[in-house]
Amino acid sequence: MTSVDVQLPRCQRLIPLPLLESPLSGRQSAALAALFDSASRGEAEQCALDTIQQEMERLPQGTRRLAVQLRMELDPAWLWAVLTDYANLSRFIPNLEISRLLWRRANVVGLEQVGAQSFMGMRFKARVELELTEHPQEQRLSFTMNKGDFRRFEGAWQIGHDASGTTLLYELTVQGCVGMPIALIEQRLREDLAANLRAVQQEALRRAAAC
């Protein structure tokens, strides 16, 4: 396991990820959130609200596992409402051009998403069809890729809440297809995942303020 050496502000330092199966179970996602929190408590002062923690693990065959957590003061119900508003995700999540609900079977949904990035004057797109399972009692959304432009794309959103505030955790395991520049994917994911959590937070705050 290799941790990425990047300079991050206090409360955004890298935390070694345990070796877990993927996609993570609800119990493992909760354990990962607890790992972030315990690392925060090990600091001279606990991480303040509205801070992001992140980690990335390099796995064999060009696979990357990433985890990003945002702590905030917000009713978890607003975050859940935003995350499950599948048809409107592309309105507020950066670089997500299309988010389309394909089907629903009880608490399992099919979702098509197309992301786009500009790099060195060129525009790249990636498409995935995801199968998401909603766990409303656990405040968790797990997803796997049925088909798309990656060999592997799976993970989960997990909302947590305690006396100190609300947390939003996103974990992703991704493996590019042969010929994909993994270094570029790694760089973009590290930047984009934090921005995505911020976008979800801002949309949830906007909706809460409008009520």
Features from the language model and the residues they span:
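Hydrophobic ligand-binding cavity/cleft-lining segments
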Residues: 2-107
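Beta-strand/loop substructures that line and gate deep hydrophobic ligand-binding cavities in soluble
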Residues: 3-6, 144-191, 195
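Glycine-rich portal/gate segments that line the openings of hydrophobic small-molecule binding cavities
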Residues: 56-62, 90, 100-147, 199-211
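Hydrophobic/aromatic beta-strand elements that line small-molecule binding cavities or substrate pockets
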Residues: 67-70, 99-100, 126-134, 154-161
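Solvent-exposed residues in well-ordered beta-strands and their adjoining turns
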Residues: 71-75, 114-118, 133-135, 146, ...
